[in-house]
C-alpha cells in the first residue's frame, strides 16, 4: 500500500541506511495496542503487537505513564550508582523466575555472549575443565543473534558466509524438548568432561537465556 510519501521515506532509508534488513514497503507512524497506522493514515493489525520480547502492544498506556514519570526524575545513569527502580526490578524478576540472582543485558545477543562466558568460567573454575578445552552444546537450527561468536554456532550458512574465521568450542545437537532422542546424550558420550549446554527456556517468556550445566 505504498504511496509517493511512503516511497520517499523508503528511498531515503535505502540511500543512507545499511542494507541489512528487508522490511515491508510500509512506513509506520503511529501504534496503539495491536494496531499500526502508516504515514498515509492506513490502519493495520500487527499480529505480533510490537516485537519479540517486547510484544506488550504499542504505546501501552501504563508503560507510557511509567516512562514519562521516570524521565522527569532520572532518564539514564550508569551502574556506577545504585538506583531504587533497578533494585526493585531485580527483586521482582528474581521472584518471578525463581533464580537467585539476575544479570541484565541490553540485547539478546549480549545475553547469549554473557551466557557463553558464564558457562565457560563455570566449567573452568567449578568443574575443573582444562584451560581452553570447554565445549558448549548448541541446538541445530538455532538463532541467537548476529555477533561473530554467535554465528559461529549457527547452522544457517546465510549467517556465516563471508564472516569467518569463527569462534571454536561448540558442538551441535538436534533440539529435543523431552531429551528422549538422545542427541545431547550422544554429545556427552564423546567428551563428557567438557560439555556445557546453553538454551533458551520457553517457560521464562521474556527472560532471555539461561545456562544449564550438565553434570
List where the protein language model places each region.
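Active-site-adjacent loop/helix segments that line or gate small-molecule/cofactor pockets in enzymes
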Residues: 1-32, 80
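Generic structural signal for well-ordered, non-membrane alpha-helical segments
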Residues: 2, 6, 33, 60, ...
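Glycine-rich loop-to-alpha-helix module at the N-terminal edge of alpha/beta enzyme cores
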Residues: 15, 43-129
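Active-site and channel-lining beta-strand-loop segments
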Residues: 26-47
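Acidic active-site catalytic centers that drive phospho-/nucleotidyl reactions
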Residues: 38, 46, 110-113, 144, ...
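Active-site/binding-pocket entry motifs
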Residues: 73, 178-179, 213
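PLP-dependent aspartate aminotransferase-fold enzymes
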Residues: 91-195
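Single conserved hydrophobic/aromatic residue that forms the stacking wall/gate
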Residues: 196-215
Amino acid at each position: 500500500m505504498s504511496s509517493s510519501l511512503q516511497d520517499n521515506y523508503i528511498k531515503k532509508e535505502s540511500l543512507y541506511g545499511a542494507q541489512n534488513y528487508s522490511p515491508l514497503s510500509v512506513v509506520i507512524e503511529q501504534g496503539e495496542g495491536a494496531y499500526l497506522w502508516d504515514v498515509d493514515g492506513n490502519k493495520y493489525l500487527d499480529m505480533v503487537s510490537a516485537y519479540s520480547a517486547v510484544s506488550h502492544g504499542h504505546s501501552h498506556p501504563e508503560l507510557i505513564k511509567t516512562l514519562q514519570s521516570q524521565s522527569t526524575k532520572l532518564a539514564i545513569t550508569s551502574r556506577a550508582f545504585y538506583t531504587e527502580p533497578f533494585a526493585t526490578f531485580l527483586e521482582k524478576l528474581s521472584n518471578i523466575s525463581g533464580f537467585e540472582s539476575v544479570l541484565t543485558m541490553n540485547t539478546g545477543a549480549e545475553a547469549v555472549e554473557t551466557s557463553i562466558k558464564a558457562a565457560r568460567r563455570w566449567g573452568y573454575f567449578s568443574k575443573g575443565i582444562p584451560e581452553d578445552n570447554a565445549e558448549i552444546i548448541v541446538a541445530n537450527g538455532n538463532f541467537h543473534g548476529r555477533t561473530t561468536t554467535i554465528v559461529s554456532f549457527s547452522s544457517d550458512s546465510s549467517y556465516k558466509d563471508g564472516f569467518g574465521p569463527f569462534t571454536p568450542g561448540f558442538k551441535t545437537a538436534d533440539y529435543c524438548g523431552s531429551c528422549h532422542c538422545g542427541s545431547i546424550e550422544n554429545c556427552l558420550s564423546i567428551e563428557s568432561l567438557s560439555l556445557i549446554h546453553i538454551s533458551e527456556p520457553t517457560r521464562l517468556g521474556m527472560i532471555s537465556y539461561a545456562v544449564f550445566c550438565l553434570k
